[in-house]
Amino acid sequence: MADITFMALHGSIGENGKLQATFDNLGIKYTGPNSLGCTLSMNKLVTKQIFKTNGVPTPRGTSLTSKTKDTPLDELGYYLPLVVKPCSNGSSIGVYICHTEEEYYDAIHKSFDVDNTDEVVIEPFI
Protein backbone atom coordinates (compact mmCIF):
# COMPACT_ATOMS: atom_id res chain seq x y z
CA MET A 1 0.00 0.00 0.00
CA ALA A 2 1.17 3.55 -0.75
CA ASP A 3 2.25 5.87 2.06
CA ILE A 4 0.00 8.63 0.73
CA THR A 5 -2.33 9.15 -2.21
CA PHE A 6 -1.80 12.28 -4.27
CA MET A 7 -5.27 13.56 -5.13
CA ALA A 8 -5.35 15.02 -8.64
CA LEU A 9 -9.00 14.51 -9.49
CA HIS A 10 -11.44 16.81 -11.22
CA GLY A 11 -15.19 16.48 -11.30
CA SER A 12 -17.79 15.38 -8.80
CA ILE A 13 -16.06 12.19 -7.63
CA GLY A 14 -12.94 14.15 -6.73
CA GLU A 15 -14.68 17.23 -5.37
CA ASN A 16 -17.77 16.16 -3.42
CA GLY A 17 -16.03 14.42 -0.51
CA LYS A 18 -17.24 10.89 -1.20
CA LEU A 19 -13.85 9.55 -2.27
CA GLN A 20 -12.18 11.33 0.65
CA ALA A 21 -14.71 9.76 3.04
CA THR A 22 -13.96 6.34 1.56
CA PHE A 23 -10.24 6.91 2.04
CA ASP A 24 -10.89 8.09 5.62
CA ASN A 25 -12.85 4.90 6.35
CA LEU A 26 -10.09 2.76 4.87
CA GLY A 27 -7.32 4.62 6.72
CA ILE A 28 -5.71 5.81 3.48
CA LYS A 29 -3.80 9.09 3.76
CA TYR A 30 -4.29 11.61 0.95
CA THR A 31 -3.48 15.17 -0.04
CA GLY A 32 -6.00 17.99 -0.15
CA PRO A 33 -9.05 18.84 1.94
CA ASN A 34 -10.83 16.26 4.06
CA SER A 35 -14.27 14.88 3.26
CA LEU A 36 -16.12 17.47 5.37
CA GLY A 37 -14.33 20.37 3.70
CA CYS A 38 -15.13 18.97 0.27
CA THR A 39 -18.76 18.31 1.14
CA LEU A 40 -19.33 21.79 2.59
CA SER A 41 -17.62 23.58 -0.27
CA MET A 42 -19.75 21.85 -2.91
CA ASN A 43 -22.74 23.88 -1.69
CA LYS A 44 -22.19 27.47 -2.79
CA LEU A 45 -24.66 28.94 -0.27
CA VAL A 46 -22.98 27.14 2.64
CA THR A 47 -19.61 28.30 1.34
CA LYS A 48 -20.84 31.91 1.08
CA GLN A 49 -22.05 31.74 4.70
CA ILE A 50 -18.71 30.33 5.90
CA PHE A 51 -16.91 33.12 4.04
CA LYS A 52 -19.20 35.77 5.54
CA THR A 53 -18.82 34.37 9.07
CA ASN A 54 -15.03 34.42 8.72
CA GLY A 55 -14.74 37.87 7.14
CA VAL A 56 -13.84 36.66 3.66
CA PRO A 57 -15.19 39.12 1.07
CA THR A 58 -17.75 37.54 -1.22
CA PRO A 59 -20.41 39.04 -3.46
CA ARG A 60 -23.95 39.04 -2.14
CA GLY A 61 -26.08 36.31 -3.59
CA THR A 62 -29.42 34.63 -3.36
CA SER A 63 -30.87 31.33 -4.40
CA LEU A 64 -33.81 30.44 -6.57
CA THR A 65 -35.72 27.18 -6.56
CA SER A 66 -37.80 25.67 -9.32
CA LYS A 67 -40.79 27.40 -7.69
CA THR A 68 -39.17 30.87 -7.59
CA LYS A 69 -37.03 30.76 -10.74
CA ASP A 70 -39.33 33.06 -12.73
CA THR A 71 -39.32 35.85 -10.13
CA PRO A 72 -38.50 39.13 -11.92
CA LEU A 73 -35.01 40.45 -11.21
CA ASP A 74 -36.26 43.79 -9.88
CA GLU A 75 -38.35 41.95 -7.27
CA LEU A 76 -35.20 40.11 -6.20
CA GLY A 77 -33.22 43.36 -6.01
CA TYR A 78 -30.69 42.21 -8.61
CA TYR A 79 -29.66 43.82 -11.86
CA LEU A 80 -27.70 42.69 -14.90
CA PRO A 81 -25.01 41.63 -15.45
CA LEU A 82 -25.33 38.59 -13.19
CA VAL A 83 -23.65 35.26 -12.62
CA VAL A 84 -25.96 32.24 -12.51
CA LYS A 85 -24.68 28.93 -11.18
CA PRO A 86 -25.94 25.68 -9.72
CA CYS A 87 -25.89 25.67 -5.93
CA SER A 88 -24.21 22.30 -5.78
CA ASN A 89 -21.85 21.43 -8.57
CA GLY A 90 -18.20 21.84 -9.38
CA SER A 91 -15.85 22.32 -12.29
CA SER A 92 -17.71 25.48 -13.40
CA ILE A 93 -20.42 23.28 -14.91
CA GLY A 94 -23.61 25.28 -15.38
CA VAL A 95 -22.02 28.66 -14.59
CA TYR A 96 -23.13 31.53 -16.83
CA ILE A 97 -22.44 35.26 -17.03
CA CYS A 98 -25.62 36.98 -18.16
CA HIS A 99 -25.82 40.41 -19.78
CA THR A 100 -29.42 40.26 -21.01
CA GLU A 101 -32.67 39.00 -19.51
CA GLU A 102 -32.87 36.38 -22.25
CA GLU A 103 -29.42 35.07 -21.28
CA TYR A 104 -30.44 35.18 -17.61
CA TYR A 105 -33.62 33.11 -17.95
CA ASP A 106 -31.87 30.67 -20.30
CA ALA A 107 -29.02 30.29 -17.78
CA ILE A 108 -31.45 29.69 -14.91
CA HIS A 109 -33.06 26.79 -16.76
CA LYS A 110 -29.72 25.34 -17.89
CA SER A 111 -28.27 25.56 -14.36
CA PHE A 112 -31.25 23.69 -12.92
CA ASP A 113 -30.54 20.92 -15.43
CA VAL A 114 -27.15 20.22 -13.84
CA ASP A 115 -27.95 20.91 -10.17
CA ASN A 116 -29.00 18.17 -7.77
CA THR A 117 -30.36 20.39 -4.98
CA ASP A 118 -33.16 22.30 -6.76
CA GLU A 119 -31.31 25.55 -6.04
CA VAL A 120 -29.55 27.96 -8.34
CA VAL A 121 -27.43 30.85 -7.05
CA ILE A 122 -27.39 34.31 -8.58
CA GLU A 123 -24.76 36.94 -7.82
CA PRO A 124 -23.75 40.28 -9.28
CA PHE A 125 -21.05 39.96 -11.92
CA ILE A 126 -17.97 41.72 -10.53
For each feature predicted by the language model, list its residue ranges:
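N-terminal glycine-rich "phosphate-gripper" loop used for MgATP/nucleotide binding
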Residues: 1-24
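Short catalytic-loop micro-motif centered on adjacent basic/acidic residues
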Residues: 5-8, 31-33, 60, 97, ...
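Short beta->alpha connector loops
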Residues: 11-13, 64-69, 126
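Short, amphipathic alpha-helical segments
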Residues: 13, 41-45, 98, 102
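Gly/Ser/Thr-rich beta-alpha loop segments that engage phosphate groups in nucleotides
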Residues: 13-16, 92, 96
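A conserved helix-loop-beta module that forms one wall/lid of the active-site cleft
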Residues: 20, 24-94
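Phosphate-binding site of ATP-dependent enzymes
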Residues: 99-126
